[in-house]
Amino acid sequence: MLAATVLTLALLGNAHACSKGTSHEAGIVCRITKPALLVLNHETAKVIQTAFQRASYPDITGEKAMMLLGQVKYGLHNIQISHLSIASSQVELVEAKSIDVSIQNVSVVFKGTLKYGYTTAWWLGIDQSIDFEIDSAIDLQINTQLTCDSGRVRTDAPDCYLSFHKLLLHLQGEREPGWIKQLFTNFISFTLKLVLKGQICKEINVISNIMADFVQTRAASILSDGDIGVDISLTGDPVITASYLESHHKGHFIYKNVSEDLPLPTFSPTLLGDSRMLYFWFSERVFHSLAKVAFQDGRLMLSLMGDEFKAVLETWGFNTNQEIFQEVVGGFPSQAQVTVHCLKMPKISCQNKGVVVNSSVMVKFLFPRPDQQHSVAYTFEEDIVTTVQASYSKKKLFLSLLDFQITPKTVSNLTESSSESVQSFLQSMITAVGIPEVMSRLEVVFTALMNSKGVSLFDIINPEIITRDGFLLLQMDFGFPEHLLVDFLQSLS
């Protein structure tokens, strides 16, 4: 449960210092609620089993003075686990303190070799080696604290308790006298309990931090593409309340390994609820940075050639057989070219009505003429304001165009005079086809990008994307991310 909690909590972290203040300054906030922890708790057994199996159990040696036998030297060697099962587990959040995990009835069978020796009254040395099994029943109590260490989530379990309900030593074949079994059962049980507690608690803590690093590395991959990445370093220690865990992240975009260290807005915990499993809060500054790096990387452009241009028009119900279209394309629609690109960085803001995008674009049409030696070029510069609402369903991102306004800036014909009817026709083409086509292509691009990063592997349930003045909120339920746990456990082997 501990590691599974970290699996979802740990978004990403690069090496930056953590603030120890109480204010919540962040570009991105992640909140995981109690219902999510209950889902993650279902897979406790796999993580605890891994901790038991990965733990190294040192040899236990000593000696004991026995009546008639003198000094008996003993050693338990090559201690390994041969069987493990877990009955149940529970998780509780302790306000401003820790995640408390209770694991009941862990049945573990250890095996190894018992070596002992003593000298008889006749000065005869006796040395024996016997295979053994230790049958144990254990309860675990793990109280885990989450901290920020150089911008990353770290875990620490200063309170880790093992309670033994059963600890029975079985010697191979029971060939030795009963006093041997009694000696080692009674005498070494205390030492064995201390060794097991120390090694198991240590390994649980190690695995938790390995998983935190694993998830943060995976998140770094999900949130990057080419020269673009995101700095989601923690801005402070994660917050624990009785109903949720919450982490606060910078959310600065990184372009070609350079990050803008902009002032962060202040986040109010009242902006998020606790009825859904998982919440993400994004400041509109995150989208402003996204627009900037996308513009710098040359991604805000579109080019359509020939038959593809005609097919796009027909997809949106544009009549390519009308006379004016044939006149404009000069009878060679298969050789027409259209390019669209942003003239400057778009401005993105979050409002109650949706995400508002202000952009200045240039649209250029190039149509060949019958002599194949000349072309007619039309160029439009326009300011476009679109209001968009996003949704996610069936592993796909959908963008709904709620409203748009187009303000023409300049229109030019680079080769010949053009009639107002031609300009009006091309303008209507931009409005009726251009904007919907760009929206459609963005849907495809973003969906493909998310799927390439493995987002489609997550069982996302009833996601909602909500815009408010100054921020965007994503809230959802989810099924256990089995694929992440499988990948993590395989990485340990």
From Swiss-Prot:
One of its GO terms (molecular function) is triglyceride binding. The keyword Glycoprotein applies. Changing residue 299 to C: In HALP1; reduced secretion into plasma. Disulfide bonds join 160-201. Gene3D superfamilies: Bactericidal permeability-increasing protein, domain 1 (3.15.10.10), Bactericidal permeability-increasing protein, domain 2 (3.15.20.10). InterPro entries: Bactericidal_perm-incr_a/b_dom, Cholesteryl_ester_transfer, Lipid-bd_serum_glycop_C, Lipid-bd_serum_glycop_CS, Lipid-bd_serum_glycop_N. It is found in: Secreted. Residues 1-17 form the signal peptide. Changing residue 247 to A: Reduces triglyceride transfer 5-fold. Slight reduction of cholesteryl ester transfer. Glycans are attached at residues 105, 257, 358, 413. One of its GO terms (cellular component) is high-density lipoprotein particle. Changing residue 433 to R: Reduces activity by 60%. It catalyses: cholesteryl (9Z-octadecenoate)(in) = cholesteryl (9Z-octadecenoate)(out); 1,2,3-tri-(9Z-octadecenoyl)-glycerol(in) = 1,2,3-tri-(9Z-octadecenoyl)-glycerol(out); cholesteryl (9Z,12Z)-octadecadienoate(in) = cholesteryl (9Z,12Z)-octadecadienoate(out). One of its GO terms (biological process) is triglyceride metabolic process. Keywords: Atherosclerosis, Cholesterol metabolism, Disease variant, Disulfide bond, Glycoprotein, Lipid metabolism, Lipid transport, Secreted, Signal, Steroid metabolism, Sterol metabolism, Transport. It comes from the Eukaryota. Changing residue 155 to Y: Reduces triglyceride transfer and cholesteryl ester transfer 5-fold. PROSITE patterns: LBP_BPI_CETP. CDD domains: BPI1 (cd00025). It is linked to Hyperalphalipoproteinemia 1: A condition characterized by high levels of high density lipoprotein (HDL) and increased HDL cholesterol levels. Belongs to the BPI/LBP/Plunc superfamily. BPI/LBP family. Involved in the transfer of neutral lipids, including cholesteryl ester and triglyceride, among lipoprotein particles. Allows the net movement of cholesteryl ester from high density lipoproteins/HDL to triglyceride-rich very low density lipoproteins/VLDL, and the equimolar transport of triglyceride from VLDL to HDL. Regulates the reverse cholesterol transport, by which excess cholesterol is removed from peripheral tissues and returned to the liver for elimination. This is Cholesteryl ester transfer protein. It comes from Homo sapiens. The gene is CETP.
